[in-house]
Amino acid sequence: MAKLVFIRHGQSEWNLSNQFTGWVDVNLSEEGVRQAQNAGALLKKEGILFDQAYTSVLTRAIKTLHYALEGSDQLWIPETKSWRLNERHYGALQGQNKAEAAEKWGDEQVHIWRRSYDTLPPLLDASDEGSAANDRRYAHLDPKAIPGGENLKVTLERVIPFWEDEIAPKLIDGQNIIVAAHGNSLRALTKYIENISDEDIMDVEMATGEPVVYDLDENLNVVSKKKLN
């Protein structure tokens, strides 16, 4: 039996200012740091010993992982960063205040962009200075792999190959894994491992800085799930 822990990054500066973040690399807020440190204390109390850690290439998730591992006295364990664990790319909405976007396009349209499983947001052009194509952390990628915007369906298609190739084999081998990532990349993984429908996943929320602990059998079926708070 292997343990799998998901942690959505602690509150970010743009969570605090109510902005669409996506692939923009913003930092944790002071509250976000506190949440990540608290996650570490909860994991230490739970007594979970990890073999491997995974996170995205975005600062808010990386720092959350480090605070959580430091708090549970496991900062030394092997760590892998992957762009495939990044947040959903919000396209041209990135950087915009959510309330102002609702005023511009209407509450219903913005709600559809945020919550529909397969509706894309307005796309960010590759020539835009804010495009990830201009960020050297993605220089190794085929430019065609860099999205201009994603829905949850596309995010799932991005995340699952990494799960299948990197994370699942270690869990099958009995290793305990921690994944510190983002609301939508973790919702995508949650949908996959819990076999949640396209409709029901839209109601699943990932709280910032809250560890979610799974016990998985040798076939990666969920035996138990609990949230630490």
UniProtKB/Swiss-Prot annotation:
Mind telling me which residues the site (Transition state stabilizer) is annotated on? H182
Q: Which UniProt keywords apply?
A: Gluconeogenesis, Glycolysis, Isomerase
Annotated EC: 5.4.2.11
* Record-linked HAMAP family: PGAM_GpmA
Report the function annotation for this chain: Catalyzes the interconversion of 2-phosphoglycerate and 3-phosphoglycerate.
Write out the catalysed reaction: (2R)-2-phosphoglycerate = (2R)-3-phosphoglycerate
The record's similarity note reads: Belongs to the phosphoglycerate mutase family. BPG-dependent PGAM subfamily.
Q: Where are the transmembrane segments?
A: none
Top EC class per UniProt?
isomerase
The encoding gene is gpmA2
Supply the InterPro entries for this chain: His_Pase_superF_clade-1 (IPR013078), His_PPase_superfam (IPR029033), Phosphogly_mut1 (IPR005952)
Q: Which GO terms describe its biological process?
A: gluconeogenesis; glycolytic process
User: Where does this protein act, in terms of pathway?
Assistant: Carbohydrate degradation; glycolysis; pyruvate from D-glyceraldehyde 3-phosphate: step 3/5
Q: Which domain of life is it from?
A: Bacteria
Enumerate the active-site residues: H9 (tele-phosphohistidine intermediate), E87 (proton donor/acceptor)
Q: Name one GO molecular function term.
A: phosphoglycerate mutase activity
Name the chain's protein. Answer: 2,3-bisphosphoglycerate-dependent phosphoglycerate mutase 2
Q: Which residues bind substrate?
A: 8-15, 21-22, 60, 87-90, 98, 114-115, 183-184
